[in-house]
Amino acid sequence: VFEHVDPFIGTEATALPEPSGLAATWWWPKPQVGNTHPGATYPLGMVSACAYSGAYPTGYGRYDLSTEGLPPELHTTQRASGFTHFQQSGTGAIRKYYNYVRVTPMLQPLDDLGRLWEITDEQAEPGWYSATLDSGIRCEITVGPKTAVHRYTFPAHRDARLVVDLSMGGLDIPYGRTVPLRAHLHALEPGVAQGEITVEGAPLAVHVECDHPHWRQMLWYDRRLMPGGTRLDFDRIRPTTLRPFGLMWAGPTEPGQVVELRFGFSLRGVEQARANLVAECGPGPSSFAERRARTAHTWRQTLGKVQVDTPSADRQTVLSTALYHSLIKPCLAPDESPFWPTDTPFAFDIATMWDIYRTQLPLLTALLPERAVELATALLHIGEEEGNLPIGYRMARGADRFSRQGSALAHTFLADLCRLGLPGMDWDWALVHLHNDLRRTYGEEFLLRGVAHPISHTLDLAYGYHCTAVLAQQVGDRALLDQFAPLAGRWRNAFDPETGLLHDSTFYEGGRWNYSFRLLHDMAARIELAGGDAAFVGLLDRFFGVGADPVKQPGLAPTEDEMREGYALHRFEGLNNEPDMEAPWAYQYAGRPDRTADVVHAIVQN
């Protein structure tokens, strides 16, 4: 599988033929653009690194902020102002966009920092990314779980330089920049420096080493060098007072001269960042080749858990690449929580549970059960320390946790692990937090009134009680089992028996048709409520556009009327949004697996 992965798939707007057949009747509001990047990654690792252009939403690529219609361009070609660390992958408007610690290889004065160079050549494979800039400098990057190693090949020049910018963060979109709250940077000795920035409430520490013994090392501030300076400290930074700052190595180069930079990262201070670097990359000073080989080996082992047999080279590549993308996030960072002092599993970029709880997480559990247990344990620690099981969780601090999207979504993941009997879980401890979480946010309204609005949360909470009952049974708590059974049955309160659909309500990125075909824990009763198999299939056929005319997709900067007309179709979105991802499989429960096959084949072919 490794050889068939193409990390560039999913980094551009889709290039697909005009939809035909059943797929031509579907309508989707979201832009058909892949929100991924081709940068260096490690399976479920903490660190990634890639070329930075400021584009939405990863920092890589050519596109501007887009939530509807066709994606507008930010750049006409692939460009980069340098190479940054920590990227989102597969998300949309996630609001925390990272792209910290930018490295810019330059032959120009420091005043040119921030300009965009054309990328004249790019290559990538799992764990490795390479780009050549029109300045003639080639960059290669590889990463470990908590580290990154850069290798730069320079042309001949009297004063080449590598500029590390610690003030950098976010995207080049409206309100997309991330400004550090505080920062410090310390040049320890020739070729070695450490620093820490507090960004989005998280303290990100870095230890960096340069393997060139004779290059000058200098701190800089506001694009001015600080000869002889060894330390920079900043506090209470705001956008109007921020000036770029960082460090630089500079010196003459011969044609083809190679210089390496090694980075260790940590959320627990500079000494742990240094320890991470030594543990993953050795004592140095050079470690690119070995780190790349080790990361490639790990990717081969991980991807090798799946075998793809197909005569189609295109489908082999698409499936292999999709598998690769499914194993980049969440980021597992053991013993790295900056928010509590104990050494525990820790995870971030759970972005979001709404996207992954019934899609990626079951796949992760099947392929890497021990990592699924690690993630589940991290979720429970987050719940214990922060008061709720997250819907979304990033390398950040704050209450912006996507609670409108759904409720009690971690419960499905935990119940799966419990049913499978995977070792390493404390189910008594898990039951405490699952039960407590059911009463938070919309949970109180659900308990008091039997229904919660938005109405989709009624389905979430009823299913959450069903899942938590699995844990109660595992630990033998009969009292909780008796409490949960009637609460799990309250999913019925969400539906209008006159229409067989959900009651009118507000909905997150969808309408009642999108949410009405969620897979529930009692599908027989759900189908009966809709009037039986035939009536339920009729509703599904209406939703999937069986026999309907082709529709027109929204264009560039669509008008409100254009979007309103599309939403009024109440049509399937082609697996392009979360609310109706499960819907094709609802046919199975009404005795029409052929219809499921029709929809799935239409998705694959279009």
Summary of predicted features, one role per range:
Residues 464:
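ATP-dependent phospho-/nucleotidyl transfer catalytic cores
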Residues 1-458, 472-493, 499-514, 518-594, ...:
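Accessory carbohydrate-recognition regions in carbohydrate-active enzymes
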